[in-house]
Amino acid sequence: MEHHLLHLVGLGEVDGVPYGGAQAVNLKSIVWYQPAEFEKRGYAVPETWDEMIALADQIVAEGMTPFCFGMYSNGATGWLATDWMEDIMLRTGNGVDSYDAWVNHEIPFNDPIVKTAATYLSQIMHTDGYVVGGTDAIVSTFFGNAQDPMFERDSNGNPGCFMHRQASFIPGFWPEEAKAGLGTETTFFAFPQMDVVSDTVLGAGDMWAVLVNDEATQAVVDFMLSDQYWTGVAENWSGTSSTRITAHTGFDTSKYWSPVVAQQAEFLKAALQANVFRFDGSDNMPTEVGSGSFWVEMTELATQGPGYIDTALDNIEKSWP
């Protein structure tokens, strides 16, 4: 475990006793796009929120749609909006300090800082023309298919959308022909800077836990954390083109089969080593909130519009155990 940061090890602790930790991590603070489509139209990759909004307005004015956005996920509908909220919270208010306070309920869910974040999110969800299919399509579009319009072309040769904020695992849901273009046709840029300039990275991951402490279990854990296991994943021995990234900060990122995955792995590795990685906030909240009221109220917000922000945040605050 010497190459697994204390932050990740701590996620598997109860009362200071380690029962597990993170095996794989994914990068969430990214926006997928197609460089050729940007270059063809003279679009610059946005580095700030205001630049992204200006670009979105330009795309709408030119008769196209800037964002893919779909959050339907069966019984888990709503988590995609919570990811947006988390990235925004890291870059507004007091940055990582208010993010940590929010996750730990040291500030209420209806705090003005949280309302500001929800207002930014609503700007994306509810501005006319910003999302594929309009606002009504957000909650009915399966998150795994949400980016598909980016890979399609209309009669004028324009893609269905130009930007999609989603984690590094999403290529696993792409159509097969789109997967072949990972890193060439489709790549990513960092989630734009906002009110608080920050290099903090949002992520999540696959966790492991030991429930039976015997030699066989230990052998499995040792193997799944080993260089041998991750070399197989990174070099695509299975032929599945996995985008999984190890939580092992000593792993040689040049082994990843795709330059894009290697770049994401290096991005995560640097964030972990610099202690600027933050695990998905809703995953660290009480179940009643993180996978309960937060999901439900973000779904309602998408449906109801910006006038529902106060009600959504008040309802989540009331649900905190």
At which residue positions do the language-model features occur?
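Extracytoplasmic "Venus flytrap"/periplasmic binding protein-like
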Residues: M1-L6, L11-E13, A36-E47, P149, ...
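Short, solvent-exposed loop/beta-turn-alpha elements that line the ligand-binding surface or hinge
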Residues: M1-H4, M71, R91-T116, E177-G181, ...
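Extracytoplasmic ligand-binding clamshell segments of periplasmic binding protein
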Residues: M71-S73, N94-E177
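C-terminal capping/gating helix-and-loop segments adjacent to ligand/active sites or protein-protein/ligand interfaces
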Residues: P259-P321
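Short glycine- and hydrophobic/aromatic-rich loop-to-beta-strand nucleating segment
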Residues: S29-Y33, W208-V210
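Short helices/loops that flank or line small-molecule/ion binding pockets
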Residues: E37-F38, A54-E62, F142-H164, E300-Q304
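Extracytoplasmic/periplasmic substrate-recognition and gating elements
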Residues: R41, F169, E176-T243
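Hinge/lid segment of periplasmic solute-binding proteins
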Residues: M1-S29, I53, I59, L80, ...
